[in-house]
Amino acid sequence: MTRDKEVWKAMTKFDYEILMLLNEKNVDNPLKAINISQILEEISVAKRKSYSTTYRHLQSMSKQGYVKCGLVDGLASTYYIDELGKAYCKAQN
């Protein structure tokens, strides 16, 4: 549990927005995974970042175990929330 809290402290507000979106939309397996453009469409304009910044955040969260890559959608990578990401969201509520 200590390790999780340390990782959670490194979470940014934008990471949190992405995780909460994936959790609320129940994007929790490779078949339901959504691409970066779809993620950005769902995030409010005031909180939205660029495509490349979003990609970097998703890559970081993937390395930490919060999200995983889903099935490829055309040429686009897709992402879904993993168990650690769900646990983080649950701990925030």
Report each predicted region and the residues it spans:
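Short alpha-helical segments that sit at the start of domains
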Residues: 1-30
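Short, conserved alpha-helical segments within structured domains
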Residues: 14, 32-35, 54-57, 77, ...
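Short acidic, hydrophobic short linear motifs in intrinsically disordered regions
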Residues: 29-43
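Short amphipathic alpha-helical interaction segments
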Residues: 48-63, 76
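A short, conserved structural fragment
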Residues: 62-72
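Short, cationic-aromatic polyanion-contact patches
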Residues: 72-93
